[in-house]
């Protein structure tokens, strides 16, 4: 029911929101995935998603600080333009418009992708894995100012015990996204197991696990 505004839930993977799947998954030419602040492109969840989405092209990217050998967190003011540059360059390599790519990532990486889209980066959709709504224990320090400018289909997948945002908090605040939105809660915390996360992403793409 892409683009609709229904709510559903139940089982180990509980979906809710305003859109069941990507509006047109057949038009997606690739998926660009970014890591969390202290991780890299080889994070196991990103690797699992690349394998599951095959043969769809997937680019798992480092941020620029990792490319320079710095393992610390990247600054948003550096991460966002770098992400946009990589997305445009990869789209050119694939011979497609940047708007045919799904952008996203885990935690900090997903937030950077959402901010890039809010700043005008074209995208077919946005994938937010364990979105860091606020720092643990600081529910008033919200990272939501840009969300009203995210106008693309969005999937958010988070663990039910994630200290960076409870399911209720995410449902309330991500509702600011005007584009089609699907929220999925899976067992776990900020680093849920890969299988339910992969299953939620494949379902959003209108595909079944292998």
Predicted segments — roles?
Residues 11-100, 111-112, 194:
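Serine-hydrolase catalytic machinery in alpha/beta-hydrolase-like enzymes
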Residues 64, 183-189:
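Short glycine-rich catalytic loops that host catalytic nucleophiles or stabilize transition states
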